[in-house]
Amino acid sequence: MFLGASGSTGNSCKNKYGFNYQGVLLLILIFFTSLSFLSAQEMATKSGTGFRQVSGIYPHLAFYNNEDECGTGAVVVWAGRLWAITYGPHLPFGSSDKLYEITPGLEQRVHPESTGGTPANRMIHKESNQLFTGPYAIDPTGNVRVIPYDKMPGRHTGNARHLFTPAGKIYYATMEEGFYEVDVKTLEPVLLYEDTNVTNKKESSERETVPVASLFGVHGKGVYSGQGVMVYSNNGEAGQKALEQFDIEAGSLSEWDGREWKLVRRNQFVEVTGPGGIYGNDHPDSDPIWATGWDHKSVILGVRNPSTGWDFFRLPKASHSYDGAHGWNTEWPRIRDIGTKENPDYLMTMHGMFWRFPDKFTAENSAGIRPRSAYLKVIGDFTRWNDQLVFGCDDSAQKEFLNKRKHKGDIEGPGQSNSNLWFTSPGKPDQLGTITASGAVWLNEEVKAGEYSEPFLFAGWPGRSVWIHHQGEQPADFTFEVDKTGNRNWTKLRTVQVEAGESLFNGFNEDETGEWIRVSVNSPSVATVSFNYSGAENRTASPSAAFDGLAQVNDQKALGGLLYGLGNNQRKLGVSAVHFDKGKTSETGYYELDEKLNLVKKNDQQTNDFMKENFAIPENVIEIDESSVLIIDDKQRRWRLPLGNSTYKQLTEAAQLRICREVATERDLFHSCGTFYELPAENADGFAKIRPVASHNFRIHDYASYRGMLVMTGIDPEARAGEHIIRSDDGQAAVWTGAIDDLWELGKPAGTGGPWKDTKVKAGEPSDPYLIGFYDNRSLVMSHDATTPVTFRIEAEPVGHGPWMLYQEVTVKPGEKYMHQFPEYFQARWIRFVADQNCSATAWLEYK
């Protein structure tokens, strides 16, 4: 200590001139300590709020509840404040969730009137000048009134303007088809159709007199009104089959005219809105109504006009983690205006893609939908506030629901559910992941001669291709037509002939333009037509400066640690810290990270032991061999992924690298050989739809979500503290913090490998599927050891759950190699190889 017990420095620290060395040393230490935290402090205060932020996430704003999940259902600017509500998973009668009010200075107020539930509704009622969100009505001064759950039970999923008395009443819709009209002055609800959570509690004799909607599907999401109807969406299906199979019939879009319900379409739908957005349409009799949905083939976009009703279009999916017949994996996709009054700018979220959506979109004026960029966050709602975008997210669920797999081991979810807001610039939706995406119009389905597919989005991608599979009895002509301007005028683009039982791959050139494309066939077929589009890959292999401080994979030393979000309202992140040093691992102790991003050592052996037992990295859940990474999923399907730096094999086998963990609700972040992947839940087809996000050369030990942030360990011991690197008070532990979507800046996906490397193969037996989708600059080298020429079928699977299709058939002479550079427009999900004779063969792919 510099000071003695009495507080005096004494004379022993002075030289003969009376100079106090220890005092100077103390000043020097304080100076350099302040330097090491200067960058972090600047980042904490640059918004003018004084609160620490990391990648647009303010830890102190995190939302917690006592439920199995804590998602953000709505974020709305009102009364000079930002208002947010959270939800638990199935709580139609209330919960521990709260109504939050956030000031421009980012101070958070938790409203004592909060009654919780599973709300995601929000509407501003212009005539009464009130915001309705959840069971709350908020006036222009911020006063809150509450509609009790005993009067209006259900999981409030949406509001709509009243069809007959819009100035005095609004509609409430629940996720289980409960419908109410509410007086905006008295807040008295009148039951229209009973929520099935209430109905199911009644005796059978009581149910007979209760009005129920009895719509197709379950798990309601969106509601909107106009053109004389109220439109409502269900995005799921009930039953055990829906929990396991993603491609069964599920969900519905329905409309109600004030008397009767009508089924519009039997698919999974989510958002229902219009150009009026949160206010309702300005011209309800004529303004369009929009609806978004999906099936196992592609995204579905519906638009209603008053004269002819509904028209439907299709768009590709960037991510399949939103799939699942039960509908649980979507949260609330939205279309919202994030522009200004002078310049509207509608942003659509759907299946992992930010989309630019035209504010005047109709069936006759359908031009302008464009992909902006892909994202990883799970977003429940968003708005523009103070020239920033604010995304309300669903980050850390204590219960991982159906998202279990052996590759995670026996790991648990966080001890307490929590989520946060994500603040970004208005341009952020254009700056994240590549827009590579795919979708089918027909998938192994019977098609009549002359039948047209639904229009599929054709504009917005630099690389476009189509895969066709024809299971007919005779050759068929597939004719493609385009709507060049989105006004329903179709012109022929090209016709291709496909032999019976065969497939065809075609690329489109830059001169083949149009807003929408459709296809027809001139003879009966069981057909698959998949459009696979490539985005421009402008990233390099170098990570951004945000990742400075992470240890390199070949480094002998690193600061590691297992991570666990604590429960029991502690609201901290536990870190069971370790040192890696020249192949040896030593425990450092137990630390906790708090909302101010202080990492402090704690004397808590019980929690440390709990973490080591329940969050250990599993062993032997993937196999790294000479050719690739072998994955055997929970359904015993085999998949292969590219290799990275050779050191990853040793570290993986030593269980020093986390392989799989949920860091955004109901999907996993998979990590193998230096590549992060988005991995859908098994009920959304799992590894078949895996998507590479970024590749790197870092030694990442563990990763987890906490207060909306992505937290990682595996830090260079010499790294200094900054915006992203948090060091402990004793300097012996450290973590990296950021947003999950920072991962796009790690480096573009790359790797080498293949399903065969000097592998003994049997004639006619396909190789394991090997991932080829979402990479660029791809090349192939094939060889064999046979004494006679070998013919290889190179097959691709563009869908993930569709048929294998022939890409090329090549013959390789003895002692020679076949080399191929895939065209830039080539896009498929998986590739495999088949030899026509027994031999030892190599199929080696390089993704640079």
Task: Name each model-derived stretch.
Residues 67-74, 114-128, 151-168, 197-227, ...:
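Repeated scaffold domains used in trafficking and secretory/extracellular systems
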Residues 60-97, 116-123, 455, 556-579:
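Beta-strand-rich domains and repeat architectures in extracellular enzymes and scaffolds
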Residues 289-291, 298-299, 315-362, 456-459, ...:
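Loop/turn-rich, solvent-exposed surfaces of beta-rich toroidal or solenoidal domains
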Residues 83-116, 134-148, 181-183, 193-194, ...:
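Beta-propeller domains
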